[in-house]
Amino acid sequence: MLYTEKEKNEIERVRKVFEKHIQQMTGYDLVWSDKVGYVWLAISIDPIYIDTGNWIESAASLCYECLNDIALDVFGMTGNDHDFEDADPLELAEIKRRWKPYIAQLPEYAYICDELLSGRK
């Protein structure tokens, strides 16, 4: 078995919390492989291609990928080509606002928000 039953159940719980977001993502997808388990794929829809894949080794790693994608959406929305380290206060406020409903359902993963934000100068 790729994951213990407990690990698989926890990954599934995180996946369900982010399910709508995952379905709406255009730059990434989460797929199941019988060989390795969950894989986070960097994709493009127009033109169609698959770039890279990262193995989702735990519920925390899935939560990290989803929270990071939400932040990247904000950076894309503002048209700024940067990451957390150069984020302005309005971008940070919007990122935190978008994270809030997910972290409310997954409070044990709130530390991931801090890890992502620790990339700030």
Annotated model-derived regions:
Residues 2-36:
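Negatively charged, low-complexity tracts enriched in Asp/Glu with abundant Ser/Thr
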Residues 11, 15, 25, 99-102, ...:
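Long amphipathic alpha-helices with heptad-repeat character
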Residues 32-106:
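Acidic, low-complexity, intrinsically disordered interaction modules
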